Amino acid sequence: MASQGTKRSYEQMETDGERQNATEIRASVGKMIDGIGRFYIQMCTELKLSDYEGRLIQNSLTIERMVLSAFDERRNRYLEEHPSAGKDPKKTGGPIYKRVDGRWMRELVLYDKEEIRRIWRQANNGDDATAGLTHMMIWHSNLNDTTYQRTRALVRTGMDPRMCSLMQGSTLPRRSGAAGAAVKGIGTMVMELIRMIKRGINDRNFWRGENGRKTRSAYERMCNILKGKFQTAAQRAMMDQVRESRNPGNAEIEDLIFSARSALILRGSVAHKSCLPACVYGPAVSSGYNFEKEGYSLVGIDPFKLLQNSQVYSLIRPNENPAHKSQLVWMACHSAAFEDLRLLSFIRGTKVSPRGKLSTRGVQIASNENMDNMESSTLELRSRYWAIRTRSGGNTNQQRASAGQISVQPTFSVQRNLPFEKSTVMAAFTGNTEGRTSDMRAEIIRMMEGAKPEEVSFRGRGVFELSDEKATNPIVPSFDMSNEGSYFFGDNAEEYDN
């Protein structure tokens, strides 16, 4: 990638750091994890949770959401100014599950946001520790990516539901900063920009006045983030066009959708980080492990090792399959919703199935669901091998992919060829090559036509044994190419509703 040198590594984004060396980065990421762990331990004490209840992923999600809501300044301000009945803007809470007389009970807890902020800061040596908050947001985002297929959102902005492999991070809040921007897929950025342009078309004052100036600079910033994700000159030039447009409108929306489609073959670079639930970090910290001292990385072996030694439980609805629930969470932990399933099966050591074949709904339990028949079971989050997370889209080739999802966005830096349905993708590029961007469009289409099926991505990269911490012996996996490679094949994944 041309601009590799100018970019900060993710760990630097993750920790708002200046240029740091590897050891400093590992220490500052470790410090962030320590803070989340200490906070989680304290919350379990406040809520009087048993060890088992503290390792329940549903309780972890509630506690994470409480602290994220306590620090959501814009929303807090909005709630104070627009009071709604029955909602106290100063309080936050959610369902906490406890085991009472041999059955699971739901208890709704409510805390002062001020109190939650105090506990969080205390766990983080008095800092606001924004990096830790962003880390939890990314974990929630990865879980959403694995659980839901954003069909409706794609269709609403004029994109194709089969482009779901570009939608990583589509549910991340706007306030997730540089670390959040790094993990957003091409489709997510395009969707945010299209929404913005549509508002400008409908609202004459959107780009005008004092506010309009801020809006404009946000628009240009988002264009630049998207440009930085593209790896070819023509795609980048197209983003310059969109950014410099005097009055963004339908022509820009067309160009954006074109560039998103092109990313199915000419993939963008999207960061991947293994962000684990707080209930994994808490017990590790309370067992005396010092993440800051030992150092930690979100993109290497560390999350795999941590999951090998963690016990996490989940509530299971009456007709759900615990093994399927485990797969869902395992994929979320490794930010692997859009990775090739054959590679995931190899790394995990058990077959990873497409979303539509899983008998499991989301991890969160709705407040109106009946608790009477709820069981709980251990989530199997261990792996057979580990692999390095990638930040590049790999290079492109073609191979049969599925009806539901026609491309992948690689998570792991491992040698393979990347599947995409070339005929399907190319069919979308008929006709329209006139207008200002015609030469770029022609160039992009030419590159896509040239993508060869036999090309291999991440050449020489492999997976590693869990005992191989220094990554000295890469094992290059061999795949059964007749197998299905896409997770959102067909598609019976539920919709994500805000």
Swiss-Prot record:
A Pfam family annotated for this UniProt entry? Flu_NP
In this chain, composition skew of type Basic and acidic residues spans 8-21
What biological-process terms (Gene Ontology) are attached?
Answer: symbiont entry into host cell; viral penetration into host nucleus
Keywords (alphabetical) are: Capsid protein, Helical capsid protein, Host nucleus, Host-virus interaction, Ribonucleoprotein, RNA-binding, Viral nucleoprotein, Viral penetration into host nucleus, Virion, Virus entry into host cell
The protein's role, per its UniProt record: Encapsidates the negative strand viral RNA, protecting it from nucleases. The encapsidated genomic RNA is termed the ribonucleoprotein (RNP) and serves as template for transcription and replication. The RNP needs to be localized in the host nucleus to start an infectious cycle, but is too large to diffuse through the nuclear pore complex. NP comprises at least 2 nuclear localization signals that are responsible for the active RNP import into the nucleus through cellular importin alpha/beta pathway.
First-listed, main subcellular location of the protein, grouped into a coarse class: virion
Query: Does the record's keyword annotation contain Ribonucleoprotein?
Result: yes
Name a single GO cellular component. helical viral capsid
Q: What is this protein called?
A: Nucleoprotein
Q: Which organism is it from?
A: Influenza A virus (strain A/Kitakyushu/159/1993 H3N2)
The record's note on quaternary structure and interaction partners says: Homomultimerizes to form the nucleocapsid. May bind host exportin-1/XPO1. Binds to viral genomic RNA. Protein-RNA contacts are mediated by a combination of electrostatic interactions between positively charged residues and the phosphate backbone and planar interactions between aromatic side chains and bases.
Q: Which family does it belong to?
A: Belongs to the influenza viruses nucleoprotein family.
Residue span of motif Bipartite nuclear localization signal: 198-216
Q: Where does the record place it?
A: Virion; Host nucleus
Motif range (Unconventional nuclear localization signal): 1-18
Cysteine disulfide links: none
What post-translational events are described? Late in virus-infected cells, may be cleaved from a 56-kDa protein to a 53-kDa protein by a cellular caspase. This cleavage might be a marker for the onset of apoptosis in infected cells or have a specific function in virus host interaction.
The organism that produces this protein has a lineage beginning with: Viruses, Riboviria, Orthornavirae, Negarnaviricota, Polyploviricotina
Give the residue ranges for region: Disordered: 1-21
Molecular functions (GO terms): RNA binding; structural molecule activity
